[in-house]
UniProtKB/Swiss-Prot annotation:
This is DNA polymerase III PolC-type. GO terms for biological process: DNA-templated DNA replication. Pfam families: DNA_pol3_a_NII (PF11490), DNA_pol3_alpha (PF07733), DNA_pol3_finger (PF17657), HHH_6 (PF14579), PHP (PF02811), RNase_T (PF00929), tRNA_anti-codon (PF01336). GO terms for cellular component: cytoplasm. Its main location: cytoplasm. Gene3D superfamilies: 1.10.150.870, 3.30.1900.20, 6.10.140.1510, Metal-dependent hydrolases (3.20.20.140), Nucleic acid-binding proteins (2.40.50.140), PolC, middle finger domain (1.10.150.700), Ribonuclease H-like superfamily/Ribonuclease H (3.30.420.10). GO terms for molecular function: 3'-5' exonuclease activity; DNA binding; DNA-directed DNA polymerase activity. Belongs to the DNA polymerase type-C family. PolC subfamily. SMART domains: EXOIII, POLIIIAc. It is found in: Cytoplasm. The keyword Hydrolase applies. The gene is polC. Disulfide bonds: none annotated. It catalyses: DNA(n) + a 2'-deoxyribonucleoside 5'-triphosphate = DNA(n+1) + diphosphate.
Length: 1401
């Protein structure tokens, strides 16, 4: 009897009972009861008829045929719509609906924020589709928002913004901008009443438009009488460029009113701009409007505990700063950072946390593998000779809740022999998909007459009674059997053995443990894989062989298997992966997390860094472990409907459980893993209930990958770039406000929703301590007695050169430097660098210094650099008499005339490049020195190993880098995305999306030579995790996980770089016997190369250049050769200045070059190196510290401030000097330029006096760009090739441009009378050009297509005797057919017969 309370206001239209399947369907009239009443009625029926398998209430819809009928029944339409679109209920309850014409309705949201949420949820589309599908009513539905309601919302937003401003202490400019945007204000033209259209709807057919949005790029270009204002604007549907000309007066107003981030409404004409090649808006009217931003208006705020930044490789969009800034704007007190398997956002998050006052919960979403899965589940004491039932099932799908068994196959084993079989189809009473039919070969015709599971399962359990159940991946098969048994009131008490887990422990060398892999390994036939009977038989045969193996290792019973085998380490690289959220509770937890990450990368990496569960258990102190997303253990267990005991074990591992919006996981419906949105909700309800049952906090998390709903387009682009076919079906992984999250979980009930959304996440945030990802302070390594050793080495060398006592100028300089270096704790750096350089020199390799280390006399005297920073001076090598020239008459000592010692008559040494120490370490000596050293590329690995010897293994790591999407790569991703979809968008939209994708992490790498040194009393895990670069598994290189910039000032970084110059010098010394360090730097012939080719004895016309610097490092490029032609340097000092000018950015072009051409200043007066700025300003009487600060800012491209300009003018600094400072983006220190020029000059000396050695060395180093075909053709062949490449201009490929440089040097060599000979199989070296009487003999690897390994193989094998045939050559060298064909082509094998066999005729 149905109670009267249910029958009130309800009309039961129809009742249908299916006896065979025990299903009841009740059809009731639509709108007869609300959702709660229907739910209560459903519960009543389920309690009244417990034997029924399924009870369904179907609501019959009345006919709605007009707009009026829809409006009349709107409240009930909303209720019915909310069953399909749950989130719509909260939206639509607050909205008004109205008729607009015959077939149109408007749904008015009370505020813009609700309108935005409804729009992003595509609610208009949902209503339209619902009315069409349910009532066959085609209506247009438009979402609008109430201006009156918006005013109220705006006031709340304004108050919230003001409160946030106070908390995060915005600067005055920011406050001005905020106040300006609080109300609409006309800036140009007149006020606009017309309704704005979406930018995506702007087309060539559009004439005058009104649009509104956010400016994301702006530029003012000053012309003769007007200013061109150009800006890009977006409303997140698309973007467009806007242009207008302004008067000077309007420009002065607007430049302070609008900027990037300003929201405006505007009107203008849509025109095609030929210059832009796109539609633009010619601006007429412009109005400031309040920012249209999502805000969190809830009094109590949530905390997001699962969020990804752009450090999740090509997967998430926002930077850590953007996330934390948004949390601050919304009033959230904390936010978690949980990137995929990395913590590389931590350093940035730490800085942003300080700036915005938001607590960062540091964490990570890891990839966990359960390395403790038991092989046997249950208590059986059975002997290995006992009974086992090996079985397999086929099903309609993966869910044991929604899917059914369609076949069971089983084999009984006793005494390791098959004694019985069981096989049957099962009628599932639901359709079998084409996918399952294709997989298993089972279709509906094969099962339609089969028995039901109710009949089959008891028989199977009887067959298996008392036996150990055996299956491959038993979790799946057994969970199905137990789930169906439970529905039938049956129990399954058998012990279970999983052959998948057993094989992992017994046969660890297999590539994987799939059934077909095992069958192949054991030579077992598997004829019809994915048929239960065949799979069971194959598994049984495999299992019998495994039983034999178990007995071999001494196992006699089933109960021993776990205890013996689980002691063995399983290969975690072959285990299934689950996601896990790991949050850091305290500093100890942070260190543990760093070690977990490091070990997961170094020991357990396979496609991703894997974390064994046992490792996490061992190191979980100070960590809070969460169950993560749908790829987490808990969610997977519920989808698989695991039995309660296993579920309990899984849940008890976690500190808290996560539930996420159903939209995040709707893709599981498409995959067939769950049936409906309702089932996803049910899983979340179940997780909530389990949390209550096992006393675990349950938190609602967003799995955030982008900030706003419309930002999903960035992730679509990223996913498409990675090749995902479903890239456009993005789940709504945006950062939700408290209201949005409460709305998502309203189905849990108001109290439970508040608990999971607000209370529990805040509880976790409260127990998390303030953690520092990188410790405060500096942690230099310690070398006992470093201070004394540095002082000793320095003074010994100084006395050796300048005598004892030292000249006052030397003594004062050394005292000042040593005090600064030692007192600031930098002696260790110097001692390390000294040891490295000393070892390299002992091993026969010169070391070039880089950067400003040459500014330090201590560095010179300790042997770190050859650059002497003292003023120009003479010093007698015999009696130590010295004379210093401090009147500025010479730029460097090398340029002074020769002079003999007045005391003993010995020719004095000339030295000194006049470089102030302050450039290196500041006036207080507290600027951290950066010692960069150029080692030979051949020697660099040895230098790295020596560093490890000095500090110990585990204390020296390569400096890590993070490779992000550069703007050009990001542009390529965006363009490709739209091209693949045949979509055309405005160039501004391409620009916006490119900007949004730029900076997202793509890979990791290593600094070319940087190493980080950890002091012996510290662990690397106190600072950073470690890993291999670019996830490479085949390298021994270990880098810091954090980008090395993040560790700057914390750990010592040594730059041990590889460079060609020391390699070149070493080869030249070996070929000539000349000691490069003794080459005179004032050699006249060598100096002449920088202005003419006279010393080379060739015609400049034929060479194509009037200077002789081809092939010289730093001076051989076309750009620098042109500088030499313009400046005509005759002194070493001028070469140093040219080096500085040529290596900077915007230092020569459009700057010094114009100043010299216009006669404003000379080469000696322009800014050529950063030192020039500081020294010139000091000479003008400016404060030393301010001069140093200006130099530092200018060399970094920051220019000078207005206040600094006024100070410079006050001291008589000319305008050209100030303007030059403003243009510079980057520039060399003088010491760097000096070191480069010294190396280049030495190589130039060899070019003049040892031409064969010079060219042999040059081409050896540039062998990759060599083309033997062209050069063997002689001068004319080379000239033709040069002309062809030059004719291509900018269209020449990088390879052709590199070849051009090589060909120019080759032409010069021919003009000097030196030729190339052909490659010789027996005489050519593997990789070096050799000097012979006939000319230069190219190496084997100079042949295009013959790699270095093939060349070495040939060179090595010919040492074992001559080749007797091509067959013999092939067999002995093992080179490819291609290499043999290339050697034949060049005549290298012409004397060899094809075969070893002799012919008698």
């Amino acid at each position: 009897m149905v109670p009267a309370t249910f029958l009130e206001n309800m009309q039961i239209k129809k009742v249908r009972v299916e006896k065979k399947s025990r299903k009841l369907t009740v059809v009731v009239s639509s709108f007869s009861s609300n959702a709660q009443k229907l739910s209560e009625f459903q519960s009543f029926l389920e309690e009244s008829f417990p034997s029924l398998k399924e009870i369904k209430i179907v609501v019959e819809s009345p006919s709605l045929s007009t707009v009026e009928e829809v409006l009349e029944n709107w409240e009930k339409v909303v209720l019915e719509l909310s069953e399909e679109y749950p989130s719509s209920l909260s939206f639509l309850k607050t909205c008004d609906v109205a008729k607009e014409g015959q077939n149109r309705i408007t749904v008015k949201a009370p505020t813009y924020a609700i309108y935005e949420m409804a729009k992003s949820s595509k609610l208009d589309f949902a209503i339209r589709e619902f009315l069409r599908n349910r009532y066959e009513l085609n209506l247009d539905v438009e979402l609008i928002f109430s201006e009156e309601g918006e005013e109220i919302a705006e006031k709340i937003i304004e108050e919230d913004i003001k409160a946030i401003e106070e908390v995060i202490q915005k600067d005055e400019k920011s406050k001005k901008e905020k106040s300006r945007s609080e109300e609409n204000r006309v800036l140009l033209g007149k006020e606009m009443k017309a309704k704005p259209i979406s930018i995506k709807d702007v087309s060539a057919e559009t004439d005058e438009v009104v649009i509104e949005g956010e400016i994301f790029s702006i530029d003012f270009k000053e012309l003769k009488s007007k200013v061109l204002m150009v800006f890009d604007i977006t409303d997140y549907t698309s973007s467009i460029l806007v242009k207008t000309f302004l008067t000077e007066e309007k420009y002065e107003i607007l430049k302070d009113e609008i900027d990037v981030g300003t929201f405006v409404r505007l009107r203008g004409n849509v025109i095609y701009d030929k210059y832009e090649g796109d539609l633009v808006i010619d601006l007429k009217d412009l109005e400031l409007i309040p920012p249209k931003k999502r805000m969190d208006l809830s009094e109590e705020k949530r905390v997001e505990l699962h969020l990804h930044t752009q450090m999740s490789t090509l997967d998430a969009v926002p930077s850590a700063t953007e996330v934390i800034k948004r949390a601050a704007e919304w009033g959230h007190k904390a936010v978690a950072i949980t990137d995929h398997a990395v913590v590389q956002a931590f350093p940035e998050a730490m800085e942003a946390s300080r700036e915005y006052g938001v607590k960062v919960i540091y964490g990570m979403e890891g990839y966990m593998v359960d390395d403790g899965i038991p092989i046997v589940t249950g208590e059986s004491e059975a002997s290995l000779e006992g009974e086992f039932v090996v079985f397999d099932i086929e099903t309609t799908g993966l869910s044991n809740i929604n899917d059914e068994i369609i076949e069971i196959g089983a084999v009984k084993i006793k005494n390791k022999k098959i004694v019985d079989t069981f096989e049957t189809f099962v009628n599932p009473q639901i359709p079998i998909s084409s996918f399952i039919t294709k997989l298993t070969g089972i279709d509906e015709s094969m099962v339609k007459d089969a028995p039901l599971i109710e009949e089959v399962l008891p028989k199977f359990l009887e067959f298996a009674k008392g036996a150990v159940l055996v299956a491959h991946n038993a979790n799946f098969d057994v969970s199905f059997i137990k789930s169906k048994a439970k529905k039938l009131g049956l129990t399954v008490e058998n012990t279970v053995l999983d052959t998948l887990e057993l094989s992992r422990h017994l046969y660890q060398d297999l590539k994987n443990y799939k059934l077909d892999t095992l069958a192949e390994f054991f030579e077992v036939k598997l004829l019809h894989h994915h048929r239960a009977v065949e799979d069971a038989k194959a598994t049984a045969e495999i299992f019998i062989k495994m039983l034999e193996k178990l007995q071999e290792i001494g196992i006699k019973s089933v109960s021993e298997i776990n205890s013996v085998l689980m002691e063995r380490e399983v290969d975690v690289k072959k285990l299934p992966v689950y996601h896990v959220t790991i949050l850091v509770k305290d500093q100890k937890g942070l260190r543990n997390l760093y070690e977990i990450i490091s070990r997961s990368n170094l020991e357990f990496f396979h496609r991703t860094p894997r974390i064994p569960k046992s490792l996490l258990v061992k190191m979980r102190e100070g960590l809070i472990i969460g169950s993560a997303c749908e790829q987490g253990e808990v969610f997977r267990a519920l989808v698989s409907n695991l039995e309660e005991k296993k579920l309990e074990d899984i849940i008890n591992f976690y500190d808290y459980l996560e539930i996420q919006p159903v939209g995040n996981n709707e893709f599981l419906i498409e995959r067939g893993e769950v049936r409906s949105v309702e089932e996803l909700k049910e899983i979340n309800r179940k997780i909530y209930e389990l949390g209550k049952k096992y006393n675990k906090l349950v938190v609602a998390t967003g799995d955030v990958h982008f900030l706003d709903p419309w930002d999903d387009v960035y992730r679509k682009i990223l996913m498409a770039g990675k090749g995902y076919k479903d890239a456009d079906r993005q789940p709504p992984l945006y950062f939700r406000t408290t209201e949005e999250m409460l709305m998502e979980f309203e189905y849990l009930g108001e109290e439970a929703a508040r608990e999971v959304v607000i209370e529990n996440p805040n509880k976790i945030a409260e127990i998390v301590e303030d953690v520092k990802p990188i410790p405060e302070g500096t942690f230099p390594p310690v070398i006992e007695g470093a201070e004394e050793e540095l002082r000793r080495i320095t003074l010994e060398k100084a006395h050796e050169i300048y005598g004892d006592p030292l000249p006052p100028i030397v003594q004062e300089r050394l005292d000042r430097e040593l005090n600064a270096i030692i007192n600031n704790g930098y002696a260790v750096m110097y001692v390390i660098a000294q040891k490295l350089v000393s070892k390299s020199l002992q091993d026969g390799y010169l070391v070039g210094s880089r950067g400003s280390v040459g500014s330090s006399l201590v560095a010179t005297m300790s042997g770190i650099t050859e650059v002497n920073p003292l003023p120009p001076h003479y010093v007698c090598p015999k009696c130590k008499h010295s004379e210093f020239v401090t009147d500025g008459s010479f730029g460097c000592g090398v340029d002074m005339p020769d002079k003999y010692c007045p005391n003993c008559g010995t020719l004095m040494k000339k030295d000194g490049f006049d470089i102030p120490f302050e450039v290196f370490m500041g006036f207080e000596g507290d600027k951290e020195p950066d010692i960069d050293l150029n080692f030979s590329g051949e020697y660099q690995p040895i230098a790295h190993r020596y560093t490890e010897e000095l500090f110990g293994k585990g204390h020296v790591f390569r400096a890590g880098t993070i490779g992000t999407l550069a703007d050009k790569t990001a542009y390529g991703y965006v363009k490709k995305y739209f091209e693949e979809r045949n979509l055309t968008v405005h160039k501004s939209e391409i620009k916006r999306l490119t900007m949004g994708c730029t900076g997202i992490k793509r890979t990791t790498g290593q600094h070319p030579g940087g190493v980080m040194v950890v002091p012996k009393d510290k662990s690397i895990y106190d600072f950073t995790p470690i890993q291999r670069p670019a996830d490479a598994e085949d390298t021994d290189v270990i880098t810091t996980h954090f980008d090395y910039h993040s560790l700057s000032g914390k750990l010592l970084k040594l730059d041990i770089l590889g460079h060609d110059d020391p390699t070149v010098i070493r080869m030249l010394e070996d070929l000539t016997g000349v000691n490069a360090r003794k080459i005179p730097l004032d050699d006249k012939k060598t100096m002449s190369l920088f202005t003419s080719v006279e010393a080379l004895g060739i015609d400049p016309e034929e060479l194509g250049t009037p200077v002789g610097t081809l092939g010289l490092p730093e001076f051989g490029t076309k750009f620098v050769r042109q500088m030499l032609i313009e400046t005509r340097p005759t002194t070493f000092d001028e070469l140093v200045r040219i080096s500085g000018l040529s290596h900077g950015t915007d230092v020569w072009l459009n700057n010094a070059q114009d100043i010299i051409r216009e006669g404003i200043a000379t080469l000696k007066e322009v800014i050529a190196a950063r030192d020039d700025i500081m020294l010139y300003l000091i000479s003008k009487g400016m404060d030393k510290k301010l001069s140093f600060k200006i130099m530092e800012n200018v060399r970094k491209g920051k220019g000078v401030t207005q206040e600094e300009i006024e100070e410079m003018k006050k001291h008589g600094v000319p305008d050209w000097f100030i303007q030059s400072c403003q243009k510079i983006k980057y520039m060399f220190p003088k010491a760097h330029a000096v070191a480069y020029v010294i190396m280049a000059f030495r190589i130039a000396y060899f070019k003049v006096y040892y031409p064969e050695a010079f060219y042999a060395t040059y081409f050896t180093v540039r062998a990759d760009d060599f083309n033997l075909d062209i050069v063997l053709g002689g001068k004319e062949s080379i000239k033709r090739a040069i002309k062809e490449i030059e004719a291509k201009g900018n269209n020449a490929t990088p390879k052709e441009k590199n070849l051009l440089t090589v060909l120019e040097v080759a032409l010069e060599m021919y003009l000097r009378g030196i030729k190339f000979t052909n490659v010789d199989l027996y005489r050519s070296d593997a990789e070096k050009f050799l000097i012979t009487e006939e000319g230069l003999l190219p190496p084997l690897n100079s042949l295009e297509g013959v790699g270095i390994q093939a060349a070495k193989a040939i060179a090595q094998e010919r040492e074992n005797g001559k080749f007797i045939s091509i067959e013999d050559f092939r067999n002995r060298t093992r080179v490819s057919k291609t290499v043999i064909e290339i050697l034949k082509q060049y005549g290298c094998l012409e004397d060899l017969p094809e075969s070893n066999q002799l012919s008698l005729f």
